[in-house]
């Protein structure tokens, strides 16, 4: 057990220091013989309004009601006669004589007689007192409860009863306990103690017993039904919970597989996109090279046939159109512009298709196949135009074919 040290004030510390200077140690008493006090006096605050010499335990030890009953019992005298018992109250004078104060004049001497000129005269009062002392002591008068109630005119120590607050229920319980205790002593079953005022007829008791017997099976049936309903509800709830858990597991597994498939497609799709882009770039390079070769061949053929010269003297709308249409330089420039525009548009379309294709290989493959088909068609068209541009084709035939293409 750890004892907390006392917190000392400045005054206590100063006093201890002064005593220690003069040879005092803790535990010694004050004085030359060291038999004085060992602890310092301490001032305490008085928190109440009681005077000096007040005993706080007096309210617990002072039995005022007992003194009151003793005083009233001392003032009563019970006389038994042939007619009956009679209670008589003593007057205040008699009570004063009985409890007279002792005479302290001759406290240490016994007065037997008075000296006179003729001689001693004995005291009559003393003789009477001696006669009274020689008699036997009288037994105390013990009063019963009924006598005390009559003497007190029905008043008791319970002050609340004067205002109508009685203890009938408590007294009834005590009486019932006494009856049960007496029944146990006699060897009978205590049962339910009943008062005379609350006694009931045997017919009513029989009816109550029958009602209880009839109610018991109904209550048991109801309790069984409630228990069965409760168990059914608990089973249903458990089944629902199991189903919910199973559905959640299935959905989680599906989501996991879908995510894994998406990741795999992303990985494979990225590789497919790279391959498709490389393949498309190669095809476009080949197309450009082929177009360039075809243009060079056509220019060489035109130069060889016409000698690179055009008649300037011929004037007219038809001849001018023919010259422009049949002029190899004009043709080659326009073709190059058209081809470059077509190639640029194809590049843009391919890039958009690759971006939109996302992460799936099937879409990218289908898009690349479609673009290949388009590029093949355009190649055929270019070849046909080159054939038409040749020296053996008329301008009328070329115009008709162009109109048909526009309609298509």
Swiss-Prot record:
Residues 116-141, 187-408 are annotated as: Disordered. InterPro entries: G_patch_dom, PINX1. There is a cross-link at residue 46 (Glycyl lysine isopeptide (Lys-Gly) (interchain with G-Cter in SUMO2)). Residues 11-57 form the G-patch domain. GO terms for cellular component: nucleolus. It comes from the Eukaryota. The modification Phosphoserine is found at residues 128, 130. The modification Phosphothreonine is found at residues 4, 116. Residues 340-354 have a biased composition (Acidic residues). The modification N-acetylmethionine is found at residue 1. Pfam families: G-patch. The keyword Cell inner membrane does not apply. One of its GO terms (molecular function) is nucleic acid binding. Residues 222-236, 245-257, 274-283, 358-372 have a biased composition (Basic and acidic residues). Keywords: Acetylation, Isopeptide bond, Phosphoprotein, Ubl conjugation. PANTHER family: G PATCH DOMAIN CONTAINING PROTEIN, G PATCH DOMAIN-CONTAINING PROTEIN 4. This is G patch domain-containing protein 4. The lineage of its organism: Eukaryota, Metazoa, Chordata, Craniata, Vertebrata.
